[in-house]
Amino acid sequence: GDVYKRQPEGPHTSAEWKIWAYSTAAPSFISAECTVVDTDGTILREGTNGWTAMSGNPNGAPSDPENGWKDPHEAMPMVGDAAAFAWAQGFMTGTVPKNDVDGWAWMLHGDMGEDNRMYLVTDEEGIAKAKADGEWIESGAHLMLFPADPSTLDGQTTDFNSGAPYVMFSGTEYAHLMIPVEGYY
């Protein structure tokens, strides 16, 4: 409905804005009942469906902390199930994710860009190299599959321009499938 699409009035530092921005990274039938967590771990809204929404920006804080994220795209929110967040926890702490089941996560607001080959490239030199190599992708709306066994993605394309689902971080323990949806390109 309208609440799903309409940005709330007020500052981007408010709980209301963050709940809207983070939860709308998934379709409304998931976002309406998901838990929403702030970047500091504070639960902004308790959910009931087993899905969680939070900012996925690896910088952890807005470029303008006083005024909050510029928009949902800068926040890079992700709405994922428990297995997706177990994967994300491993990813962010540099440990190997251990899941018995595949994880799923939505990022309908896209992201600010990634080196498709190597994770957590955030320095200017690394970004410039990825761009020069044609491996920098600023993703639009997508769904992600975090396989319990990343080797199940072996042989899938890594070509993010093909329009087909593609593997990001191929050959690493963090390999996952990016599934573009309408608005990706």
Predicted regions and their residues:
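A residue-identity detector for tryptophan
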Residues: W17-W20, W51, W69, W87, ...
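Residue-level detector of short, conserved catalytic/binding motifs and their immediate flanks
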Residues: N49-W51, L143
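Active-site-proximal beta-strand/loop segments in catalytic clefts of secreted hydrolases
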Residues: M54-G56, A148
